[in-house]
């Protein structure tokens, strides 16, 4: 920053000095040298080397010779470059449309073009927000109308024998009222219905089975009916009587591959009877053997009076009954 300020300061001083020196042309500048030797040196002329100016062959027009050859090639390269640029731009637009189908420039452009098309009708055009959301609301509006027609037969009013008075106006439902607040074109005036003569048919019931079948079941299930009984014909075989069915049960069992075939016993031998292994003999008691007290019990009984805090204390009565030391001593 100081260097720039110093530079501009010197330039201003030089300009001011040159302006003031215009009135005195005979005055020499301060950097002029009055040495006579320098004036003689300034009179010396140095020879300049001859330089060729212009083309070496001025009569030959190189541009006219090369241009017809190189210009088609240049045009081809330029066209290829433009084509590549157009393909890149188209690929970019396609990727943007796939990633964000509602935020691309082309979609917005088409949307505004559709909105700016002149209408042939004389009715008032709906608002902009309604025209934008109309493609999304039309399917729901159609389904709502169809459902309203189907639900017209369901009522909470009890059935009576008298014919109710026919209504002359139709009122919009709750959803239509809600949508009409944001979309004025959906507002409709109450339509007059021609008065019908009273009929003798009763009013629909609250739980009409046909209505519920039509709402909650498929068409093929609703239209399914019980198959009629086949009519007797000379070509139809009547079913066999019950007695004959009992007789043919053994014959039919032979054709079942998952049951035993009784005819196979003619080609096989009977299996040997299953016998148990012989039981061991009970040893005969020796009358000359001296018994040594009570026999040893196979299962030790647990002392109910056993105290783990005093393991050495034992009940002599229980020890005797269990065949312990007391029993062996007394035996």
UniProtKB/Swiss-Prot annotation:
An annotated GO cellular component: extracellular space
Phenotype upon gene inactivation: Normal physiological responses to hypertonic stress, such as accumulation of organic osmolytes and activation of osmoresponsive genes, are constitutively activated with mutants exhibiting resistance to normally lethal levels of hypertonic stress.
Expression (tissue specificity): Expressed in the hypodermal syncitium but not in hypodermal seam cells.
GO process terms (BP): regulation of gene expression; response to osmotic stress
The organism's place on the tree of life at top rank: Eukaryota
Span of the signal peptide: 1-21
Keyword list, A-Z: Secreted, Signal, Stress response
Location in or out of the cell: Secreted
Role: Negative regulator of the osmotic stress response. Acts via the transmembrane protein ptr-23.
Protein name: Osmotic avoidance abnormal protein 8
Species for this entry: Caenorhabditis elegans
Lineage: Eukaryota, Metazoa, Ecdysozoa, Nematoda, Chromadorea
